[in-house]
Amino acid sequence: MQLYLNFHNHIILVSSNEEATLIKLREEFNFFVQEMADSVQTTVEIFREVPPELPPMVAIKLTETCSIFKIGPRRYIDYRGEALTIWDKQEQTVRIYSLDHDRLYEISFLAIHSILGQELEKQGVCRVHALGVSLGTTATLVMLPSKGGKSTLLTHLIENPEIKILSDDMPLIDMNGNVHAFPSKISMDKKPEDGPLSRLSWTEFKRTQYPTKWTAGLSQLKDRIETKNLGKRMILVAGFRLSKGQSILTPVPKWKMILPIIEHMIIGMGLPQVIEMFLNFNVTEIFKLIYHSAIRSICAFQMLRKAKCFYFYMGPDRSYNAQLILDQMYEMQNSSI
């Protein structure tokens, strides 16, 4: 079986000898699926089988979860014999092997995100680790760390029928500061019991280093996905959790957003990726890292230049948290009509 994914005209061909993994990836990247392609830029091959034996090599890096080897353009990421990724930068191919279905899907999912992140940046489009929603022509991005409450906030915002989704945790920003949707999936610690999201079909996502999550593909909410690119009116929020007390959404000068932007966009903490694919140890790769950092910085600057900025001190009242965001979105939208 095979699957074509089109990310801003970078085509990734995904093939697998296991149908279940490909079905899950199709649902994850549903909005980027196309039936055929005349040319392919990257190939990802997924094998549910015993990883092949490694050739004689010296490890260039050891981590808690894997050993990394390199021969010429090929990089081998050995997950303690349980899984193996072979990335050939010259041929633009990634081969992933494992007998463990959950491990196979997790590595494949992260590998595709890693590839598209770098390729999008070559086109001047960057990811930001944030919840993205829209109201009319007003886009709102809420930057929060992993497990900070982005999906929980979305479950309450989406109860308003005028709210549309840009992304659960990874909208895109171009070099003009415009926001592009990246609708993949919603991830929750537990399945919602009420509201629009409770009616979705949820799947268990078992992760190696992190607790299990429940995910639902946004293809089930096609009428709630934002299809326009937005940029004229933007609210940019840096969120902080409170142990107790009432939530506060307060405007701040743009310079106060520099550190949150560095964390959530320029460094990209929390963005899905196989970091081992990009651990490099030569001068050429260091220059590439500087290049990608520069692209992210330009996108971030243009986004910040357009945005009205807020700090959001979030208390335990989730409905009130959502209402504060909604009130600000309506105020901006109505003031610009």
Role assignments for model-derived ranges:
Residues 1-146, 159-164, 172-337:
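A noncatalytic interaction/capping subdomain that flanks phosphate/NTP-handling catalytic cores
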